[in-house]
Amino acid sequence: MSAVSQPQAAHAPLEKPASTAILCNTCGNVCKGEVLRVQNKYFHIRCFVCKACGCDLAEGGFFVRQGEHICTRDYQRLYGTRCFSCDRFIEGEVVSALGKTYHPDCFVCAVCRLPFPPGDRVTFNGKECMCQKCSPPTLLGNSAHVAQGLRSCGGCGLEIKNGQALVALDKHWHLGCFKCKTCGKLLNAEYISKDGLPYCEADYHSKFGIRCDGCEKYITGRVLEAGEKHYHPSCALCVRCGQMFSEGEEMYLQGSSIWHPACRQAARTEDKSKETRTSSESIVSVPASSTSGSPSRVIYAKLGDEILDYRDLAALPKNKAIYNIDRPDMISYSPYISHSAVGDRQSYGEGDQDDRSYKQCRTSSPSSAGSVSLGHYTPTSRSPQHYSRPGSESGRSTPSLSVHSDSRPPSSTYQQAPRHFHVPDTGVKDNIYRKPPIYKQHAARRLDVEDSSFDQDSRKKTTWLLLKGDADTRTNSPDLDSQSLSLSSGTDQEPLQRMAGDSLYSRFPYSKPDTLPGPRKDGLDLRNANLAPCGADPDASWGTREYKIYPYDSLIVTNRIRVKLPKDVDRTRLERHLSPEEFQEVFGMSIEEFDRLALWKRNDLKKKALLF
């Protein structure tokens, strides 16, 4: 890059023979009459203008830069060098010292304010430049040795005779010898020293630099140390409050997380305040006034010596079979219910209303017109959950199966039955996430009193519903109509009767509504209905539910930024929405290997992958 200041362009008449055409260097047309000549090039007077502003250059000075002609004002504005002392553009002779440029008259001694004589030694004490007369005298004891040492270059070792010298690291250097020890780059600005040797910033960081454990960048300037970790002051943030740490403030370090002392104490206090109120093998449910959106509506579960808190239970689906305890201490009997023919609807307690309003297994056929005389629950080898019921004697009661008609709500009398009896402990602690119970539902004699077209003879019908936690079939379609659940056209078609009432108290407290087909002699008619078991585990295996695949970036959850996840994802099973290839990349193992890990290990891996 070169810029040459040119005098005014010369007006020259066209002296070449007419046979040889002279072209304008700007427009390329033939030059006729009076032209301008700059070096060996010719221009029309109207074509010789500034490249930047377009002003006429025929009457003033200009600069040539990379073949372009620029006026003085634009050249200084675009490419000019300013004096470090007076901040004006430098034209002509320039003095460079310590990476800065000066006018010769502006580069003066800091003490006597006189310009430095040509060839005089310049002493730089780290702040100011002083001439040889104003520099501090050397010690008298070894003046000859010191004087000789000051005249030797710290880089090449040669004597500094005439010209300027650079003082750095207690040595004198030729201006061209003060270079980086590693890459040999000329150090005319900032540098970093190590063991008396100068380095540029990049090479110093590559050899001796300290990386920030927060942003993984090199630390220049202030550094915050926490144990063996180092941080920029702006990168050390408390994981609880997100605030920075002040200088000298105490901090707690836990893994890769750092805490303020007050924030850590507050977190411990919150952990201690969570006390379990359960028996040896029971689950505490929230009051009936709680919202139904809380995960499984469970706060704590105690199974033997193991206590499962909300974080462990949050990793399970909302209807996970956590209630299927294979080794119960108690087995509860359902109370007896008697219905009257005509009366107002029975008002239940607050706990019953909450259970009834939740998702329950019931029939959805719209053709029911009769009433049911009795419905009861048959206990199996597994005990149902104990619920808090206001007004009961012991604070516990048993779930019951109450059946009502939609058209005629009967009134019922609630009679308490013996509550509990003990079962010997088998000593075997089974897996609580498997072996859901088998329910048996008996429908007694049904009478149709409103439709004269139906048969008046009473028939005894029994419907068996087997619920299996590992069932592979699920109902994915909308509510089935009565035609899809009816019998074939060759037989007597019996109208589907809906179990009257909106509440069905089964031993599984939270379950999904399903449609049951019409009964026949040998049991359920499964030709036209694809039954989904109530309370079945939707995440028992990868094959029972199809998870929509999303990229890993859209599933990440952090505590600093509120991330909006897709609507159809399972928030407790975010890793199920990864493709097998991306799952292998994120967790370093296959899906089958991940499922064989313990629950706490899976949760720990999900936390590290920001999927928890």
Curated annotation (Swiss-Prot):
GO CC list: actin cytoskeleton; myofibril
CDD domains per UniProt: LIM1_abLIM (cd09327), LIM2_abLIM (cd09328), LIM3_abLIM (cd09329), LIM4_abLIM (cd09330)
Keywords (A to Z) from UniProt: Cytoplasm, LIM domain, Metal-binding, Phosphoprotein, Repeat, Zinc
Name of the gene encoding the protein in the UniProt record: Ablim2
Major site of localization recorded for this protein: cytoplasm
Tissue expression pattern: Expressed in brain. Highly expressed in caudate/putamen, moderately expressed in the olfactory bulb. In the hippocampus, expressed in the CA1, CA2 and CA3 fields. In the cerebellum, expressed in Purkinje cells.
Domain HP: 544-612
Limits of the LIM zinc-binding domain: 22-81, 81-141, 151-210, 210-270
Sites bearing Phosphothreonine, chain numbering: 473
Name the record gives this protein: Actin-binding LIM protein 2
Functional note: May act as scaffold protein. May stimulate ABRA activity and ABRA-dependent SRF transcriptional activity.
Listed InterPro entries: AbLIM_anchor, Actin-binding_LIM, Villin_headpiece, Villin_headpiece_dom_sf, Znf_LIM
Positions with biased composition (Polar residues): 394-416
Annotated binding of Zn(2+) 3, by residue: 212, 215, 232, 235
Chain positions with Phosphoserine modification: 282, 294, 365, 368, 453, 477, 579
Start-end of Low complexity biased regions: 279-295, 364-373, 477-489
Pfam family membership, one: AbLIM_anchor
Assembly: Interacts with F-actin and ABRA.
Residues engaged in binding Zn(2+) 1: 83, 86, 103, 106
PANTHER family hit by this protein: ACTIN-BINDING LIM PROTEIN (PTHR24213), ACTIN-BINDING LIM PROTEIN 2 (PTHR24213:SF6)
Annotated binding of Zn(2+) 4, by residue: 238, 241, 260, 263
Skewed-composition ranges (Basic and acidic residues): 269-278
Gene3D superfamilies, alphabetized: Cysteine Rich Protein, Villin headpiece domain
A GO molecular function held by the record: actin binding
GO biological process, any: positive regulation of transcription by RNA polymerase II
Subcellular location: Cytoplasm
Residues passing through the membrane, by range: none
